[in-house]
Amino acid sequence: MTTENKKGYFGEFGGSYVPEVVQKALDKLEEAYNKYKDDEEFLKEYHHYLKNYSGRETPLYFAESLTNYLGGAKIYLKREDLNHLGAHKLNNVIGQILLAKRMGKKKVIAETGAGQHGVATAAAAAKFGMQCDIYMGALDVERQRLNVFRMEILGATVHAVEKGERTLKEAVDAAFKAWINNINDTFYVLGSAVGPHPYPSMVKDFQRVISQEARRQILEKENRLPDMIIACVGGGSNAIGAFAEFIPDKEVKLIGVEAAGKGLNTDRHAATLTLGTVDVLDGMKTYALFNEDGSVKPVYSISPGLDYPGIGPEHAFLRDSKRAEYVSATDDEAVNALLLLTKKEGIIPAIESSHALAEVIKRAPKLNKNKIIIVNISGRGDKDVAAIAEYLKNK
């Protein structure tokens, strides 16, 4: 099921707003993607590596202690944190790098915020013998030292971007610029369901495995579909992967949780769908956070994977068509959710995923015990432990 209504558009959102030189490269990418996305050999190889390299499928885990503590709906965790390298990112990276190989590319470039996509890209590049350059905002480099070191020992060159807010937006800009300068031999491995067509559709297809598994797993366990799917939203790749197979099931509520940072009434947040306006950002038409002069607003979140001032175009469409609902969680709510899951289930979730858990904590107690929530645990929290310790110390 796709909500794409004409090439590269979801309603009015999406498209490809890029210079001609980039459009030519995107046309070649789209051609290769269309050629291989239903190709039996390609899919066989892709699923082989998902199973044997990434360790899929990931469990759908009944969080019994958390369910009992909150006293309402049954809570299931989709354990994307158990993927190789600790997040959902590898689902997409394996697909894109296998595509790059078939296109004859020798080098890959990627942007990264929390570092998870960078680590996944560096690992897959090492596995498939490709040169790898990663662009990361200098502030994120400071926040995610361990992931930077991981990328480096995997053989990648990490470029710390010192411009602007020194976070994900600047990393995307720098990676894009580097790609344009080396467009013939380089493949841009985009980490989220954002950017110009065909990236949002391609990333969704490679992340769709999350909901393909979750749908089958919940039917096996409960003999029915869930009432609600909840996932955190930065650019939106884990959420679109978790939503994809459930979009046609109108009785299943889809809920995306953005970063409210220090609060929606401050300028320290990244709540794009809550407070953004429609314009062009990073080659796509979507909701984004802009100043009155048209410049992109600085965004903030405790979570380096959620501080992006835009949103994937399909999420913009799902919001406007009312198929999905988008809410937000503050830093405090996310940290409290992280600590609660850790104490109740012995699972340390990523601070990104903890935003989704914060919404579960709000909703589950208000629902009957026969209701079912699936929350996507998009990554594990090892990378965040030092930052959380610092955050709690300064409270």
Swiss-Prot record:
Its cofactor is pyridoxal 5'-phosphate. This is Tryptophan synthase beta chain. InterPro entries: Trp_synth_b_CS, Trp_synth_beta, Trp_synth_beta/beta-like, TrpB-like_PALP, TrpB-like_PALP_sf. Its EC number is 4.2.1.20. It comes from the Bacteria. Keywords: Amino-acid biosynthesis, Aromatic amino acid biosynthesis, Lyase, Pyridoxal phosphate, Tryptophan biosynthesis. The beta subunit is responsible for the synthesis of L-tryptophan from indole and L-serine. Belongs to the TrpB family. It comes from Fusobacterium nucleatum subsp. nucleatum (strain ATCC 25586 / DSM 15643 / BCRC 10681 / CIP 101130 / JCM 8532 / KCTC 2640 / LMG 13131 / VPI 4355). It catalyses: (1S,2R)-1-C-(indol-3-yl)glycerol 3-phosphate + L-serine = D-glyceraldehyde 3-phosphate + L-tryptophan + H2O. One of its GO terms (cellular component) is cytoplasm. One of its GO terms (molecular function) is tryptophan synthase activity. The keyword Amino-acid biosynthesis applies. HAMAP family: Trp_synth_beta. Pathway: Amino-acid biosynthesis; L-tryptophan biosynthesis; L-tryptophan from chorismate: step 5/5. GO terms for biological process: L-tryptophan biosynthetic process. The modification N6-(pyridoxal phosphate)lysine is found at K89. NCBIfam families: trpB.
